């Protein structure tokens, strides 16, 4: 089974990333925290048998910043669409359109996620059409699919 994983992220620019933390941290500290999150999740992704993609915002941002953090061996492409749902859908549609059997899309500010969590999600996709990684607050940190589903 050909597996792909998309890291869905912003380019860590001071004042533009992790802005909800700015009452507590400086813009530079927020960008540094984001960089640390990117490195942590990238380390876990390397342990999984999947091709890794990075889907970034803003689309006119300097992708070299991300390449310096995550490495040049990944494919990078910009997020497209108006809403978060549209951007996620277009990302999954693009990567699955490259011939992958399954694809996981995940955020990057989840330091607790480990490679076994990702492997488990890929295992679920052997039996199911979709998988979600739930968060304690009722949201999700990961979505995986065999084919892009617009809903």
Regions found by a protein language model. Give the residues of each.
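Short beta-strand/loop segment that forms part of the nucleotide-sugar
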Residues: 50-59
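Short phosphate-binding loop-to-helix
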Residues: 66-102
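Conserved donor-nucleotide/metal-binding helix-loop-beta segment in metal-dependent transferases, i.e.
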Residues: 111-140
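N-terminal nucleotide-binding beta1-loop-alpha1 segment
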Residues: 1-20
